[in-house]
Amino acid sequence: MDVLFIHQNFPGQFRHLAAHLAADPKHRVVAICQPHAPRHPKVPNTFVYQPARKPRPGTHHYLHGMEDGVLNGQAVARVLLKLKKQGFAPDIVIAHPGWGEALYVKDVFPATRLLSFFEFFYHSDGADANFDPEYPLSFDGRARIRTRNALHLLNLTACDAGISPTHWQKSLHPAEFHSKISVIHEGIDTRAVAPNPRQTFTLPNGKILTFQDEVVTYVARNLEPYRGFHQFMRAAEEICRRRSKTEFVIVGGDDVSYGQRPSDGQTYREKLLQEVRIDPKRLHFLGRIPYERYLALLQVSSAHVYLTVPFVLSWSMLEAMSAGCLVIGSDTTPVREVLEHGKNGLLVDFFSPKHIADAIEEAFSHESRVQLVRRAARQTVIESYQLEIGLSRYQKIIESLVASQVEMTARETAAIDQ
């Protein structure tokens, strides 16, 4: 089977799936991505695309994302046409269409099955936007969100089938497309991400943390309100007042992945450090760190705080559970799909730093009960989010799509012969 992956940041969500398919000699795996993408060592046949230009400044700002998507789609189509000219015709294309790259796949390869990864469908109410009253949504923002979904609607109509990683993320898409979308989480490697009570973690100041220390961890791609960074810092201030030995270890960059940047040019980290009073000797900002070091941090964590507005569920929460962390998660819809309060984690009010701090303190005060919750957290990932489960489900839908195309081609050929 010839498989083509399209993802601007390949491998992205397809890291494990691409490796799994590439390991089978029956498959030829090819990928298309942007030049900055990390790529995958097991997929050497990776081609890059480069949009001809950026969206024009004169384009209406509601349509910048759409124009960007069209430019990306055109650039990918040029690569596809070259591959087609060289004789390559994929049996299936697996794409993250969020940036427009898959818009014209069917125009180049009409018979090829297109499996698209549907991560999010935007709403001005009921999801991320307008959730946090500290960051209200303007009418202009509402209109921009409605327009932004035009690209996603094109993607939904173009694909043969879709994947969403959680039931909640699927539910955000228009009901008329639900029959197209299967829920398959890409999966967590539970063998690699596992508890290790003998692990140590050395801080930049030379202090060595172990599983016996009071260690509160927080991880995000970037430190920003979408992932509750402001509420975490306020809760950390409260814990710092209550307990003298707690260390706070924070992983994440100073950029903004989602939402708006601060209007004054500061980072959210700078703004929160001006607001809260925390002993700087116990507050450790690590920035972005290598994956192995991140896993070691999870393994010494006493309480892992994961806060998010209703948005895409982070891999880091499931990885923390797989590592045996006590996860203190916001009582928001994507988190509730996985965490059951008191059973495999603790749910807290996103808007209450005191409630978050109380849950952190519970992690230090009820060791025997917390151990049961930790074990249940890992078991949840093993039973429902383990890598092998995701790969198996992906394999089934891929085989089904390709088989349906083969069957359709056979019927068409038979009709011609008659």
Q: Which residues are covered by each model-predicted region?
A:
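Carbohydrate-associated surface elements
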Residues: 168, 187
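Conserved donor-binding/catalytic core segment of Leloir-type glycosyltransferases
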Residues: 202-227, 233-238, 248-249
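Acceptor-binding helix/loop patch of EC 2.4 sugar-transfer enzymes
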Residues: 53-63, 112-150, 191-196, 200-202, ...
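Aromatic "clamp/platform" in nucleotide-sugar-dependent glycosyltransferases that forms part
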Residues: 309
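Nucleotide-activated donor-binding/catalytic signature segment of Leloir-type glycosyltransferases, i.e.
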Residues: 256, 261-288, 292
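A short, well-ordered alpha-helix in the C-terminal region of glycosyltransferases
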Residues: 362, 369-384, 390-396
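Conserved acidic donor-binding segment of nucleotide-sugar-dependent glycosyltransferases
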Residues: 341-342, 346-353, 362-367
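Short hydrophobic beta-strand element within catalytic cores of glycosyltransferases
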Residues: 326-329
